[in-house]
């Protein structure tokens, strides 16, 4: 995983509510366990339209997806955040996310940011870049408005350090070894 740094990017706007995981990446592309190449299947059915937002040259290299309400609903599939991160997205902004999509995203270096409806509307009506500061949990809108967002401390730590759950445990190896050395295993008298 790549450490999550503060960044600034214009927004790719997808003003569609209730985008489910099958629309993010259709089920026919879920046979792989590799993340490589999933960006080509991201929003595959919609990308058949040459005017779809991801097909526009000005969308290339942008790192923030501004999505409609209830983004990532539907079935649990880790391929959805994989495809989004393979495209280059570091964050998705919406008023709400499906819980399982939110958890899958946090475990795969994609920051889901929930904002109030008024901020959401402001972002859809603005054109400049937004700034994301994960350590301070702030989103700065193109107009300069600073908005606090929530993220649990464990996920925040993992994103900032660029580690997954196993990486986090491995970071604690010296402390675990010290604890085990100072607490000998009990003798099993029944053996």
Swiss-Prot record:
It catalyses: (2R,3S)-3-isopropylmalate = (2S)-2-isopropylmalate. It is an enzyme of class 4 (lyase). Keywords: Amino-acid biosynthesis, Branched-chain amino acid biosynthesis, Leucine biosynthesis, Lyase. GO terms for molecular function: 3-isopropylmalate dehydratase activity. Its EC number is 4.2.1.33. The keyword Metal-binding does not apply. GO terms for biological process: L-leucine biosynthetic process. It comes from the Bacteria. GO terms for cellular component: 3-isopropylmalate dehydratase complex. Pathway: Amino-acid biosynthesis; L-leucine biosynthesis; L-leucine from 3-methyl-2-oxobutanoate: step 2/4. SUPFAM superfamilies: LeuD/IlvD-like (SSF52016). It holds the Pfam family Aconitase_C. Signal peptide: none annotated. Belongs to the LeuD family. LeuD type 1 subfamily. Heterodimer of LeuC and LeuD. Catalyzes the isomerization between 2-isopropylmalate and 3-isopropylmalate, via the formation of 2-isopropylmaleate. PANTHER family: 3-ISOPROPYLMALATE DEHYDRATASE SMALL SUBUNIT, 3-ISOPROPYLMALATE DEHYDRATASE SMALL SUBUNIT 2-RELATED-RELATED. NCBIfam families: leuD, PRK01641.1. This is 3-isopropylmalate dehydratase small subunit. It comes from Solibacter usitatus (strain Ellin6076).
């Amino acid at each position: 995983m790549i450490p999550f740094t503060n960044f600034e990017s214009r927004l790719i706007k997808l003003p569609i509510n209730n985008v489910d995981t099958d629309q993010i990446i259709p089920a026919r592309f879920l046979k792989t366990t590799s993340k490589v190449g999933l960006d080509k299947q991201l929003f595959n059915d919609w990308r058949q339209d040459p005017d779809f937002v991801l097909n526009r040259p000005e969308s290339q290299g942008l790192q923030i997806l501004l999505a409609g309400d209830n983004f990532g609903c539907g079935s649990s599939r880790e391929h959805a955040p994989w495809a989004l991160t393979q495209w280059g997205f570091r964050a998705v902004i919406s008023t709400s996310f499906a819980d399982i999509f939110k958890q899958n995203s946090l475990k795969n270096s994609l920051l889901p940011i929930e904002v109030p409806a008024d901020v959401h509307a402001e972002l859809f009506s603005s054109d400049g870049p937004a700034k994301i500061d994960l350590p301070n949990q702030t989103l700065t809108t193109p107009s300069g408005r600073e908005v606090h967002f929530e993220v649990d401390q464990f996920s925040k730590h993992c994103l900032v350090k660029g580690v997954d759950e196993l990486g986090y445990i491995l970071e604690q190896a010296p402390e675990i070894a010290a604890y085990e050395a100072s607490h000998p295993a009990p003798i099993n008298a029944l053996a």
